[in-house]
Amino acid sequence: MFVLYINDLKKTLTKAQLNLFADNTVIYVICDSFRECYEEMNDELKVFADWLKLKKLNVNKTKCMVVTTRSRNDCNGVVQIDGEIVERVDAIKYLGVMLDEMLNFNEHVNYTIRKAARKFGVLCRINRYLTFDNKVMVYKTLIAPHFDYCASILFLASKQQ
């Protein structure tokens, strides 16, 4: 039902690209200059804020973030939504994948390794109490899914990772 409610959003934004999945929305622009990107994004976010008001929806401003693929030194603009500045971050988690400003997925690889290592630590602590079959089941249940989800990204890991 929610998808039907927000289906016209794609037609509302003219300069920005939009990715929708369930209640997750990503709005992004691709431009040649940094100034142009900030201008287009701010223009589109004004349209987006008006659309939200029309639909009687609120944006969760604590989950709004800006990631750019340029160095911080090149970036001195601000993105605003409904008069509030949107936080600029180095990486975001989107649908379980860490996206960083370099788009090299190092952040995601490290994030996946940390999550799996914590679960492996649990397995090591209870190791002596489990049969071989139970160990395999715990591995397949707790650890393997971290490597299976978006596995193709993990192939981008550097040799030291």
Positions of predicted regions on the chain:
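Short, conserved non-catalytic motifs in the polymerase core
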Residues: 1, 28-34, 79, 83, ...
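Conserved pre-motif C helix in the palm subdomain of viral-like polymerases
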Residues: 1-15
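Hydrophobic alpha-helical membrane-association signature
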Residues: 1-5, 41-44, 112, 119
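Non-catalytic, peripheral interaction segments enriched in hydrophobic/basic residues
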Residues: 14, 21-22, 53-72, 94-161
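Short beta-strand/turn micro-motifs at beta-sheet edges
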Residues: 14-16, 84-85
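Beta-strand cores of modular interaction/reader domains in eukaryotic scaffold and signaling proteins
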Residues: 19-21, 26-28, 58, 80
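Catalytic palm subdomain of template-directed nucleic-acid polymerases
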Residues: 26-53, 70, 104, 156-159
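Short, conserved micro-motifs composed of acidic
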Residues: 43, 57-90
